[in-house]
Amino acid sequence: MKILAAIVTHNRRALLTRCLDALDAQVRRPDGVLVIDNASTDGTAEMLASRGTWRVGQSNLGSAGGWHRAIAETLAHGFDAVWLMDDDGHPDPQALAVLSGAITPALACISSVVLREDAPDRFVFPFPALDTDGHPALLAWPRKLATLPELETRTRDRTYPFAHLFNGALVPRRTIDAIGNVEPAFFMFGDEVDYFYRMRRVGPVLSHLDARHYHPDVTVRPLTETKLYYYLKNTLVLNHRYMNRPAMRDAATVGVGLYRYARRNGWRAAVEAVGSPSAVARRAISRGLAGQVGRDHGG
């Protein structure tokens, strides 16, 4: 299998360098490495040129536009699979060997688990407990599996039927041929969830516990007004596109989004997001419930 490792980046030269070094250290080396550069201005292009790394530059089309271009290049250059990852994480040396050894014709995708680099038994993005339909459970306890030992109690053959794309996801060409490319209109947030559910239509999407991808803790990062907007809008779109009990999920989405925004920016900022003249949250909710995707707020 001819595998392309593809990274999407924007102004994270140091972290991107670390990720590229981790690709060089893979036991099973990728057959090509591509960086989609979303208009970086921090010397990324020069760094990649000095390493001789294949770079495709484009305007900042967000994560969704980056993944769309990476998959298009995979198809155009005749690769059998693409290994997709963001620029701020880095794979364990065994990761691609595990994934490429575990992929079968029956699977739509197999992905790494994403672990905190400062606490490598804890997930950056906790796994949901799943209901009988395979959706994240609303009423289970615990609803989230936050550590590797917790997930191990729920797995079969070291795999779990859910994945947090795109942090070490191996996607075969046959899956792309069947479902198409990532939808670039999502811009940021939700593109990976949309692709996950589209892939599940053609086969299982699994995370493999022995394929590890290390990543910074995202809970300490700023949550800007723009990020809140796209999180709310796109998650509401997805609730109605794929999920059971969408109204309950909508309420949870809005509550969780505003709580996270308040924790990082203060409760006054959260109240203004709902009640101020700009009312970014209200606009996001209205457009999300109308099913609108697209780049329609901020940068």
Predicted features and spans:
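Non-catalytic, C-terminal membrane-associated alpha-helical segments of glycosyltransferases
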Residues: T226-N234, N244-G299
